[in-house]
C-alpha cells in the first residue's frame, strides 16, 4: 500500500489570522489485527478539564477517521462505577461507527474516580485471539479517589486493582497506554509506572484538542496510516480557504479532519472539482475520500471561522 507525501501547502485566507504552522510527523506501519480498548474517566472532575465535552469528541473523531480494515474498538466509561461498556467492535461501516459513538455519548461526567475498577473491567472485555494484538488506552485526569463514594470500595482497593490489572496485562502481552488528561490531579508516576510495566508509554494531553494527536501518536507502530497537520492557527472572523497540493500515490482512503474548541461553521471540501459530503459534529468535522485517484493532485477546503477561533486541520491516509 503506497503512501502520499505533502509537497506544498498554499493557504489563502480572506481575513487576517495568526497561524502557528506545524510540520506533521508521519507515522507508517504495516501491523494487522488490532483490538483497542478505550478506558475513559467520566468522573466529576472531568467537567472542569473538559467543560465542552471535546475529549470524548476526540475519541469519536479517532473512530471516524482511523482506517478500519483490521481494527476493532472497545470502550469503557467509568467513575466510581462502570457506566457504559462494550467489547471490541468492528468499525468498518458508518452504522458501526455510529453505534459506538452513541455509547461514548451516553453518560455525563459525575462521581468519584476508580481507575482500578475501570482498567480491570476493560481488561476482562479483551478476548484473547492469537492473531490479534491487544492494546488498552487509559484516559484519566487524576489518581483513584473514592472519598465519599458509597460503592463500598476504597481508594486503596482501587490502587491494588490497578496494580493487579497491570500485572495481568504484562503477563498477556497487552500494552497499557495511559494519558494524563487536562490539569491532572495527583502524581502521574502511577500512570507512567503501569504503562512502562507493559512496555508502553504515558502521554500528557493538557487540552482536549491535543488528545487526537496523542491518540494517533500512540498507534504509529500499530496501524497502517499517515497523519499530517496542515494548519494550527487562530483565525479572524470570515471565510478561510486552504489549497493543498499532493503528489505520489495515496492509500485507498483519505480523511480530512478539522478540530476546534468552538463550534465549527460550514465546511466545504472539493476534490476533482466535486464537493465531498462532510459530517459536522460540532467541535470536529470529517470528510472522507474513498479510493483517491492518483492523477488528482489538489484538494481545496473552505470553512467559516468566528473571531479568534482556534482551528486545526489534518489529513489522514
Name each model-derived stretch.
Residues 202-317:
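C-terminal "exit" segments of structured domains
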Residues 28-90, 107, 115-122, 127, ...:
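Von Willebrand factor
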Residues 18-30:
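Sec-dependent signal peptide cleavage junction
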Residues 9-19:
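Bacterial N-terminal signal peptides
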Residues 50, 106-107, 112, 117, ...:
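VWA/integrin I-like adhesion module and closely mimicked acidic/polar interface patches used
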Residues 33, 70, 131-133, 173, ...:
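A general structural motif
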Residues 1-8:
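Bacterial N-terminal signal peptides that target proteins for export
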Amino acid at each position: 500500500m503506497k503512501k502520499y507525501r505533502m509537497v506544498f501547502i498554499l493557504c489563502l485566507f480572506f481575513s487576517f489570522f495568526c497561524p502557528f504552522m506545524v510540520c506533521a510527523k508521519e507515522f507508517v506501519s504495516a501491523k494487522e489485527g488490532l483490538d483497542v480498548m478505550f478506558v475513559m474517566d467520566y468522573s466529576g472532575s472531568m467537567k472542569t478539564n473538559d467543560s465542552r465535552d471535546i475529549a470524548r469528541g476526540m475519541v469519536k473523531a479517532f473512530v471516524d477517521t482511523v482506517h478500519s480494515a483490521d481494527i476493532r474498538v472497545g470502550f469503557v466509561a467509568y467513575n466510581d462505577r462502570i457506566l457504559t461498556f462494550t467489547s471490541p467492535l468492528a468499525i468498518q461501516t458508518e452504522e458501526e461507527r455510529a453505534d459506538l459513538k452513541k455509547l461514548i455519548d451516553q453518560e455525563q461526567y459525575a462521581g468519584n474516580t476508580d481507575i482500578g475498577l475501570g482498567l480491570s473491567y476493560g481488561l476482562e472485555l479483551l478476548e484473547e485471539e492469537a492473531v490479534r494484538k491487544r492494546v488498552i488506552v487509559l484516559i484519566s485526569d487524576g489518581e483513584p479517589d473514592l472519598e465519599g463514594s458509597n460503592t463500598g470500595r476504597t481508594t486503596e482497593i482501587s490502587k491494588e486493582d490497578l496494580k493487579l490489572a497491570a500485572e495481568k496485562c504484562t503477563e498477556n502481552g497487552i500494552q497499557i497506554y495511559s494519558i494524563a488528561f487536562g490539569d491532572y490531579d495527583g502524581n502521574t508516576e502511577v500512570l507512567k509506572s503501569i504503562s512502562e510495566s507493559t512496555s508502553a508509554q504515558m502521554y500528557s494531553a493538557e487540552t482536549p484538542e491535543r488528545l487526537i494527536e496523542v491518540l494517533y501518536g500512540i498507534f504509529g507502530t500499530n496501524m497502517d496510516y499517515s497523519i499530517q497537520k496542515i494548519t494550527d492557527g487562530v483565525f479572524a472572523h470570515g471565510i478561510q480557504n486552504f489549497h493543498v497540493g499532493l503528489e505520489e500515490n495515496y492509500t485507498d482512503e483519505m480523511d480530512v479532519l478539522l478540530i476546534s474548541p468552538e463550534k465549527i461553521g460550514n465546511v466545504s471540501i472539493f476534490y476533482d472539482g466535486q464537493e465531498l459530503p462532510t459530517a459536522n459534529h460540532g467541535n470536529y468535522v470529517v470528510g472522507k475520500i474513498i479510493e483517491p485517484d492518483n492523477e488528482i493532485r489538489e484538494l481545496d477546503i473552505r470553512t467559516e471561522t468566528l473571531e479568534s477561533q482556534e482551528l486545526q486541520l489534518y489529513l489522514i491516509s
